[in-house]
A protein has these predicted regions:
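Flexible, glycine/charged-enriched surface loops at secondary-structure junctions
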Residues: 22-30, 188-200
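Long, charge-patterned amphipathic alpha-helical coiled-coil/hairpin "stalk" segments used as oligomerization
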Residues: 80-188
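Glycine-rich active-site/cofactor-binding loop and its immediate structural neighborhood
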Residues: 56-93
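Glycine-rich beta-alpha junction loops
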Residues: 205-209
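Translation machinery proteins
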Residues: 5-71
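Short, charged, intrinsically disordered terminal tails
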Residues: 213-221
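Residue-level signature of catalytic and energy-coupling elements of molecular machines
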Residues: 10, 14, 75, 120, ...
Length: 221
């Protein structure tokens, strides 16, 4: 773990590992992990945002939207898998969780208060910082379909994890997603954070090793 690898070489190495391992799971997820030099206990050093991956995620994201009035239909028209108001809140409260992302309009936030216990631990609570609390539900749905992923630094360890595509992607597609994600994380450096912000960057696969990336090679061509 102490040797630094060129980003493109790391992608190729992991793709070759999957091929050579004879794993039945041939289309594995590539994941980016970034260790941040922040104090997660400090309110002014929280890192949470989102990024639209230029090559997409390679998987279908199931989107649920909590909205009122005509915005419920707008969400459905944009392609949301589920949309509703009180009845959808009740369904989630009763334990239904057949979605990957939850989007809510600002006027429904009082309804969502009762879902904190259910959604919080799963990291599914809508938040304005990552664009999941918005009045423009149609845009939020379209962005998510286009490959938008949200991320946040974990409270313990200050590590950001996010998927950057599938092993079926080309090296260029994975590299473009990797660079976009790293740039977005860099952009979200809290002003109160001192010292080295991005301490280490790793790329790993679902069933295999993680490789430490030389950050100087994370430059878009």
């Amino acid at each position: 773990f102490n040797t630094y690898t060129d980003a493109r070489l790391a992608i190729d190495t992991l793709k070759k590992f999957i091929k050579d391992s004879g794993s039945k799971n041939t289309n594995q997820t590539f994941e980016l992990s970034v260790k941040l030099g922040i104090d997660t206990k400090a309110n002014d050093q929280q890192v949470r945002s989102s990024v639209v991956l230029p090559s997409g995620t390679g998987k279908k994201t199931r989107i649920a939207v909590i909205a009122k009035g005509e915005k419920v239909q707008a969400a459905k028209d944009a392609g949301a898998d589920f949309a509703g108001t009180e009845e959808l809140v009740q369904k989630i409260q009763d334990g239904w969780m057949e979605f990957d992302v939850l989007v809510a309009t600002p006027d429904t936030m009082p309804l969502l208060g009762k879902l904190g216990r259910v959604l919080g631990p799963r990291g599914l609570m809508p938040n304005p910082k990552d664009g999941t609390v918005t009045a423009d539900v149609a845009k939020a749905v379209k962005d998510l379909q286009a490959g938008k992923v949200t991320f946040r630094a974990e409270k313990t360890g200050a590590v950001v994890h996010l998927p950057i595509g599938k092993s079926s992607f080309s090296q260029d597609e994975l590299f473009a997603n990797l660079v976009a994600a790293v740039q977005e994380i860099r952009k979200n450096k809290p002003s109160a954070s001192k010292g080295t912000y991005m301490e280490s960057v790793f790329v790993s696969i679902t069933q295999g090793p993680g490789l430490k990336i030389d950050q100087n090679t994370l430059v878009a061509v």
